[in-house]
């Protein structure tokens, strides 16, 4: 499994409640560009419309070797391929106040298909973010002290 892009801010800004694996509909030059790692997930989010899941605001840079007439919108909405029950479950979460669905990472699976890891998340407050940072620093300090004693 080769990771093409990760949304590093997602785990910092959100508390991930549940994750899903979704296929994504891309054009040929988008696939080539994505496999080169030209993907940005930072501001992306998922919406459910008419029983279909769509990924908004994900930036895929135009493929370098594609001619000018074939270049499309780099931030267009892209359809996610999920089972109907998964879409309904995500829709149930999205109707609750304070919950959202965001992409966590994009990767190539063992069969060569590009997949997107979707997380249903709740936004963290500034206090929660500080607490997480503090816990991480304490854990790092304990590991550092443990290494010195050996």
Swiss-Prot record:
The keyword Chloroplast does not apply. Gene3D superfamilies: 2.40.280.10. Keywords: Cytoplasm, RNA-binding. Pfam families: SmpB. One of its GO terms (biological process) is trans-translation. GO terms for molecular function: RNA binding. InterPro entries: SmpB (IPR023620), SsrA-bd_prot (IPR000037), SsrA-bd_prot_CS (IPR020081). It is found in: Cytoplasm. Disulfide bonds: none annotated. CDD domains: SmpB. PROSITE patterns: SSRP. GO terms for cellular component: cytosol. The keyword RNA-binding applies. HAMAP family: SmpB. Belongs to the SmpB family. Required for rescue of stalled ribosomes mediated by trans-translation. Binds to transfer-messenger RNA (tmRNA), required for stable association of tmRNA with ribosomes. tmRNA and SmpB together mimic tRNA shape, replacing the anticodon stem-loop with SmpB. tmRNA is encoded by the ssrA gene; the 2 termini fold to resemble tRNA(Ala) and it encodes a 'tag peptide', a short internal open reading frame. During trans-translation Ala-aminoacylated tmRNA acts like a tRNA, entering the A-site of stalled ribosomes, displacing the stalled mRNA. This is SsrA-binding protein. It comes from Coprothermobacter proteolyticus (strain ATCC 35245 / DSM 5265 / OCM 4 / BT).
């Amino acid at each position: 499994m080769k990771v093409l892009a990760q949304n590093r801010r997602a785990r910092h800004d959100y508390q991930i409640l549940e994750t899903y694996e979704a296929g994504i509909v891309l054009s040929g030059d988008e696939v080539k560009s994505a496999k080169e790692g030209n993907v940005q997930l930072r501001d992306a989010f998922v919406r459910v419309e008419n029983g279909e899941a769509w990924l908004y605001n994900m930036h895929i840079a135009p493929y370098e070797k594609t001619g000018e007439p074939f270049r499309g919108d780099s931030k267009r909405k892209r359809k996610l391929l999920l089972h109907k029950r998964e879409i309904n479950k995500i829709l149930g979460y999205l109707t609750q106040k304070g919950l959202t669905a965001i992409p966590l990472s994009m990767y190539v699976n063992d069969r060569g298909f590009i997949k997107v890891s979707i997380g249903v998340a709740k936004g963290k407050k500034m206090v929660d973010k500080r607490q997480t940072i503090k816990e991480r620093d304490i854990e790092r300090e304990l590991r550092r002290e443990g290494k010195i004693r050996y």
